[in-house]
Design a protein with these regions (language model features):
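Acidic Asp/Glu-based divalent-cation binding sites
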Residues: 9, 49, 58, 94, ...
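Beta-propeller blade termini
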Residues: 35-42, 84-91, 113, 133-142, ...
Length: 221
């Protein structure tokens, strides 16, 4: 388990033992203001690596795992201001893991391409709304390509971006909602074979569902 200590700019690694209670193994420094940690295999060695977003330095720290509970020195990638939630997938069909990050200070989602060795290179930004936070990816319109959905915490709404398989996304439309979406997830919630969305509202402490139609459109349940 990895835990971000924002005030100390550290990541703490906890190792589980036979008691089932994780114990602190060690910690290491990261860029200022670590916020959200993702576990993803970026260099395709079948070992989970870490990606740490830092609000204070506007960076992503890519920390490759050795496979024995230790990690290599971080590779730091500069992104837009205030990186929040990320999504991962193969945006351009080259077999490597790519990333996208909601950058709140830029009112956009930033797309990065991976090279299969643990590096991420910024490719493009797409305008979302004010203070984007939540981000999720799946094939919303059933064309075989991954798409993006981004929730805006300040302006409300969910921006839908359809991918074309080359690493490029086109903004299709925005779902109108008054909810200040802080996180966003997807899944086939009604088992009809079509992806739906779930939005967490920060102010109302509620979970709102949107039903997908398989064409990239979503409607409140």
């Amino acid at each position: 388990m990895a835990v971000a200590q924002a005030g100390l700019s550290k990541v703490v690694i906890l190792i589980n033992d036979s008691t089932g209670i994780p114990k602190v193994s060690y910690s290491f420094d990261v860029e200022r203001g670590p916020h959200i940690i993702d576990g993803v295999d970026l260099n395709q060695d079948k070992i989970t690596d870490l990606v740490v977003g830092s609000l204070g330095s506007h960076t992503l720290s890519i920390i490759l795992a050795n496979g024995n509970g230790t990690f290599k020195e971080a590779n730091v990638v500069k992104v837009g201001r205030f990186p929040h939630y990320r999504a991962y997938g193969d945006w351009n069909g080259d077999g490597h893991v790519d990333a996208a990050v909601a950058v709140g200070g830029e009112e956009s989602v930033e797309v990065l391409l991976g090279n299969g060795m643990g590096d991420l290179k910024p490719l493009a930004r797409y305008v979302t709304g004010v203070n984007p936070h939540g981000l999720t990816s799946e094939d919303f319109n059933l064309d075989g390509e991954l798409d993006l959905a981004v929730s805006n915490r300040t302006s409300g709404g969910i921006a839908i971006f359809l991918g074309d398989g080359s690493g490029t996304f086109q903004k299709a439309y925005s779902i109108i909602t008054e909810h200040d979406g802080i996180t966003l997830s997807n899944g086939d919630f009604n088992k009809d074979g079509i992806i739906d969305l779930a939005l967490v509202s920060a102010s109302s402490n509620s979970l709102i569902f949107y039903k997908g139609d398989g064409k990239g459109n979503f409607h409140p349940w």
